[in-house]
């Protein structure tokens, strides 16, 4: 059988008609795949919208026995957002009686226990969870009010007494509250002026003996409270003075005895 061969057949180059046919078949396959993917996406979107519509609560006026397919497919994003908003919990509206009882309970205790909350919830016909949430919100409001009142109070004080902070700090915490401690202490013999006749410490005589004749030179007011030393220091100080005074008395007694014996000897 004689068969003619073209140069394209010998070289293995495909025919132009076959190339066009292959390209057409490939394009049709790709288009079919794209259509299938879009159809799947549309089905998933429709199913999702149907689920959202089923989950959304309906109003009594909008309740119907069935939903048409056109309504299901034509649901817009605004409707979906409305459904999401409807999922949120509605705010609890309290009656005047309920608010009155809640405020009375809050005045008694800001942190009521579970039993008190349950009793109050039964009294005002509310769930215990709602009562607990009300107390949490009321405590937060109370804290905010306390902070605002404290800030206003301090602001008013600063307006009325602008230098009250400085004067209080300077009077309560002076730079040198006891300037006489830096000076040299007197001798032990002069400490007898510190005591009354009953043996108690006299702070005024102590300050005067140390050289402060007037408190106005120190810019200090006379003490309104009796000055006292710490218990241990007072005992040590009094013991020291008593030993010094007793030794002084012994020395004076020995001197007088020696003088008397000498006088007696001279007279004899």
Curated annotation (Swiss-Prot):
Primary location group: nucleus
Domain of life: Eukaryota
CDD domains: homeodomain (cd00086)
UniProtKB keywords: Developmental protein, DNA-binding, Homeobox, Nucleus, Transcription, Transcription regulation
GO-annotated biological processes: positive regulation of transcription by RNA polymerase II
Assigned protein family: Belongs to the paired homeobox family. Bicoid subfamily.
Gene Ontology cellular component annotations, sorted alphabetically: nucleus
PROSITE patterns in the cross-refs: HOMEOBOX_1, HOMEOBOX_2
GO molecular function, one term: RNA polymerase II cis-regulatory region sequence-specific DNA binding
DNA-binding region: 87-146
Keyword Secreted: no
Protein name, UniProt field: Retinal homeobox protein Rax
Chain positions covered by the region annotation Disordered: 56-87
């Amino acid at each position: 059988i004689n068969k003619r061969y073209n140069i394209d057949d010998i070289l293995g180059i495909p025919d132009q008609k076959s190339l066009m046919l292959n390209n057409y078949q490939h394009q049709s396959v790709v288009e079919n795949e794209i259509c299938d993917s879009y159809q799947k996406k549309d089905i998933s979107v429709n199913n999702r919208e149907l689920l959202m519509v089923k989950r959304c609560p309906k109003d009594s006026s909008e309740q119907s026995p069935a939903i048409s397919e056109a309504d299901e497919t034509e649901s817009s994003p605004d409707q979906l957002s409305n459904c999401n908003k409807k999922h949120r919990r509605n705010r609890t509206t309290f009656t005047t009686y309920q608010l009155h009882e809640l405020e009375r309970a809050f005045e008694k205790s800001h942190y009521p226990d579970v039993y008190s909350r349950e009793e109050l919830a039964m009294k005002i016909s509310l769930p215990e969870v709602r009562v607990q949430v009300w107390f949490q919100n009321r405590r937060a409001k109370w804290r905010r009010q306390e902070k605002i009142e404290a800030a206003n109070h301090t602001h008013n004080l600063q307006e009325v007494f602008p230098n009250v902070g400085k004067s209080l700090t300077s009077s309560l915490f002076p730079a040198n509250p006891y300037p006489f401690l830096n000076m040299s202490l007197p001798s032990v013999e002069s400490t007898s002026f510190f005591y009354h006749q009953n043996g108690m410490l006299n702070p005024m005589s102590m300050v005067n003996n140390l050289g402060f004749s007037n408190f106005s030179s120190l810019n200090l007011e006379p003490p309104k409270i009796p000055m006292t030393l710490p218990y241990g220091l007072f005992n040590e100080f009094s013991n020291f003075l008593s030993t010094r005074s007793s030794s002084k008395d012994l020395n004076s007694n020995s001197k007088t005895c020696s003088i008397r014996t000498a006088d007696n000897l001279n007279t004899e």
